Amino acid sequence: MRIAVFADKFSGTLTSDEVIGEIKKIFKYNNIKSSFFPVTDGGENSTEIFKEYGFETQQMSMKQDFSGKWLPVETLKVNKNIYIETSQLIGIKNTNDLSLDLNTSCLAKIIEDVDILSMGGSRTNDAGIGLLSKMGIDFLNNKDVIEDPKPKDFKLINNIKINESFKKVNKKVLIDTNIPLLGDNNAFKVFGPQKGLANSEIKFLEKNVERILNLLSNEMDSSLDPFKEGTGASGGLSFALGEVLGLSLIHI
């Protein structure tokens, strides 16, 4: 008998290849015949795993991440689609900066160039508000636009304006969790601590994000659902992509 072993990463500890390496040692010692296959949920390090299965690099280019650093960012050809792993630009390993000082606005520069975006492995907790601020939605304090809003600025937001440049986006998003953005078991409570959030900061985000999304829902004259499964991926980025921008969320 031969055993097939499929291994994903153990976030924050081992890559899928490292997991396979440890299992191989045990199987070899016990003379167990096996075949090994790295797998991915579309999150962090998914680019490397896709390449192991023959998907080719579409482009390697220098992009600015959420901390301001210029990094080589890789997109892949996946069947007839262009794929990007968003953690390359907003990943938890990119910086030690506080997540309240970070947002997703850097993704606005790549979203038009790809067909599929993957979630997971982020340090962000901005519910995609940073990205939305670059996609035609202004977040204001009274009549003053808050440029590039970050979570630390959320308490200042008391008005929202939808500009003519705002439009829906016909693309796909791979999400690696069923956790909602808001609710009892929300993204801030579940993933916030591993991104350095204190309990007081989690409560701050819950309160202000819900308030801001109510403003946004009223301004769009649309029912936005931050309690829907899967809207909490990458600090709520999947909410902004799916509920506001209209991308299709695919659970994997």
Short names for language-model regions:
Residues 1-4:
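Extreme N-terminal starter segment of soluble prokaryotic enzymes
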Residues 6-22:
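N-terminal beta1-alpha1 ligand-phosphate binding loop
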Residues 22-26, 53, 128-141, 190:
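A glycine- and small-aliphatic-rich helix-loop capping segment at beta-alpha/alpha-beta transitions
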Residues 25-94, 171-181, 188, 238:
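Glycine-rich nucleotide/cofactor/substrate-binding loop typically near the N-terminus or early
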Residues 78, 82-118:
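Hydrophobic alpha-helical hairpins/lids featuring a short glycine-rich hinge
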Residues 86, 144-145, 149-152, 171-236:
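Carboxylate- and glycine-rich phosphate/diphosphate-binding segment that chelates Mg2+/Mn2+
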Residues 102-112, 116-119, 123-170:
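Glycine/threonine-rich beta-strand-loop-alpha-helix active-site module
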Residues 250-252:
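Conserved small/polar residues in nucleotide/adenosyl-binding loops
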